[in-house]
Curated annotation (Swiss-Prot):
Catalytic activity: RNA(n) + a ribonucleoside 5'-triphosphate = RNA(n+1) + diphosphate
One Gene Ontology cellular component: DNA-directed RNA polymerase complex
GO molecular-function terms, A-Z: DNA binding; DNA-directed RNA polymerase activity
Keyword annotations: DNA-directed RNA polymerase, Nucleotidyltransferase, Transcription, Transferase
Gene behind this protein: rpoZ
E.C. numbers: 2.7.7.6
Oligomer status and interactors: The RNAP catalytic core consists of 2 alpha, 1 beta, 1 beta' and 1 omega subunit. When a sigma factor is associated with the core the holoenzyme is formed, which can initiate transcription.
EC primary class: transferase
Source organism of the structure: Saccharopolyspora erythraea (strain ATCC 11635 / DSM 40517 / JCM 4748 / NBRC 13426 / NCIMB 8594 / NRRL 2338)
Protein name: DNA-directed RNA polymerase subunit omega
SMART domains, per the entry: RNA_pol_Rpb6
Pfam families, sorted: RNA_pol_Rpb6 (PF01192)
Family: Belongs to the RNA polymerase subunit omega family.
Amino acid sequence: MSTPNALAAFNSSPSLNAPEGITNPPIDDLLEQVSSKYALVIYSAKRARQINDYYAQLGEGLLEYVGPLVEPGPREKPLSIALREIHAGVLEHTEGE
């Protein structure tokens, strides 16, 4: 049961926030930091694993891994943090490692 008023209210409602994660930073900007999309996947996955291990070791009192080098958002996932670090250029990447 739709009415013209209901449709007008639906069309004028504010849109949802833009999605975060792999769309921010843009993939094209990230590819400028590495040689290929495959290198980007490996590079970001390794860094995300380090960030995840860092958070896991905090409770144990160990400091073997380096934490996030950019300010993480609330409940931001390690892969999103790693991609933002790559985009910001705070990591040095060498091919083959």
